[in-house]
Amino acid sequence: MGACCSSRRNRSPSLAALAEETEVVLRCLAGRVVDLPGGDEVRIAPDVGRPGQNFGYFKFPGPSRFAYVKFIGRAYALGSGRKFLLYLSRNFQVFGYEDGTGLHMLAKSLHDFLKFKGLSDRDLVVVDSVALTSQLRPLTLPIRSTSDVETLVAEEATTNYTSTENLLGQTQSSTHRPLGVPLSNVKTMGVPPTKPSSQRPRGKGGRPPARLKSIREETVSGMARAREECNSPSEHDRLTSEMTDCDSDSSVSSVFF
């Protein structure tokens, strides 16, 4: 008499449970970089948790065959440098779209893709379809990712900063330049203008006061004294004449010592 044993087969999770699990995982990984099995990586879109964001379609062969998909991020094969746009289908299968090779079936669920599969099946299951946008237009690559937008913002900030530096440099250089102010508006701090002779203060009888007269006399006498000093031979002239009177054979040391 033989014995037979059997194990209960693991049932696939229902679609509602799979949808809930996928939503929780995407909400937790939104905007993050996750390592994939095999050394590759995936970058989850920052707005992936919002409903109705970044959706598109895949057109399969046949009349009016469109599959609704949702964009969730980008996957990078670091060894080969290949890049895939990741999409989730209505039954939460993971697809990767590469420019030139088309659509790849990567995993049956997001859990399998992140934990087991990664990009290992990128060349095994290739689906013949055309990627379309939410307006049913052909998908044009490359699409700007979050890192591309951050790089663009950083470049704009650098340009603004450079222009600000140039503006500050022009302002600093302009401070060393004279301002273009007309001469009529400039007030000099020199000697005040002299009054005409008709407005000068005079003493009695229209004559200048005695103090001004004495100042004039002192000025005239000082000028005469300076003239006499200029006309008289100075000490330097006398020394020069003495040097000239010396014999031509005498050295410079004999003159000064």
Curated annotation (Swiss-Prot):
Domain of life, source organism: Viruses
Comp. bias intervals (Basic and acidic residues): 214-240
Annotated region described as Disordered, given as residue ranges: 163-257
Listed InterPro entries: DUF1314 (IPR010741)
Start-end of Polar residues biased regions: 163-176
One Pfam short name: DUF1314
Protein name: Gene 3 protein
